[in-house]
């Protein structure tokens, strides 16, 4: 059995610019050690269709971590295939632990972290007290952060990605649109670095 843990670029790996943040690991992720491993989860196909990854090997999170500068973690590290089995109380109790973890990750990245992409709305909304009633997919306003948001992350973009779970009720076009917007932001960033 593989070991479940956050996957972040380290040492000789490509510097980390983006961390994808799930709600909690599926049972498949917990046992395999690979993120978004549930067969009904569309995460990898969404990245491919949006043009964020371009080769078949990039479907493996290990390859993305080592060669592409992506990281992966979950807000709450409790396995299960139904996010609703994790109560609002558990999410609230976990919030300071998660914020401390993500701040520590950012410290280790030495300023290379550009964006946090929450894969699904629920885990973002429950970082607020009281939890947000609603939020839109896409890039979040810079002034809309949880009260205990670490200062180190103040300039880091926050994106809310549509859930790739088979349980989420969205059309294919709705689900894909924000991933395309994210891919466009990567392209824009590369163009800015060239000029």
Report residues per predicted region.
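Short amphipathic alpha-helices and their capping/turn segments at secondary-structure boundaries
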Residues: 3-12, 56-66, 101-106
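Short glycine-/acidic-enriched loop or helix-start segments at secondary-structure transitions
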Residues: 29-32, 126-129, 170
């Amino acid at each position: 059995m593989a070991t479940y843990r956050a996957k972040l670029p380290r040492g000789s790996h490509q510097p980390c610019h983006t961390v994808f943040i799930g709600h909690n690991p599926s049972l498949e992720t917990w046992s395999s050690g690979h993120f978004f491993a549930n067969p009904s989860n569309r995460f990898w196909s969404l990245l491919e269709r949006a043009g964020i990854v371009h080769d078949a090997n990039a479907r493996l999170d290990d390859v993305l971590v080592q060669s592409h500068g992506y990281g992966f973690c979950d807000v709450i590290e409790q396995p299960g295939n139904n996010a609703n089995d994790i109560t609002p109380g558990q999410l609230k109790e976990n919030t300071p632990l998660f914020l401390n973890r993500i701040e520590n990750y950012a410290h280790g990245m030495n300023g290379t972290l550009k964006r946090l992409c929450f894969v699904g709305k629920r885990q973002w909304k429950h970082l607020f007290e009281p939890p947000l009633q609603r939020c839109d997919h896409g890039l979040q306003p810079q002034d809309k952060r949880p009260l205990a948001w670490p200062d180190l992350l103040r300039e880091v973009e926050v994106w809310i990605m549509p859930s790739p779970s088979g349980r989420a009720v969205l059309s294919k076009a709705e689900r894909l649109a924000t991933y395309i917007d994210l891919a466009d932001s990567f392209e824009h960033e590369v163009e800015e670095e060239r000029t």
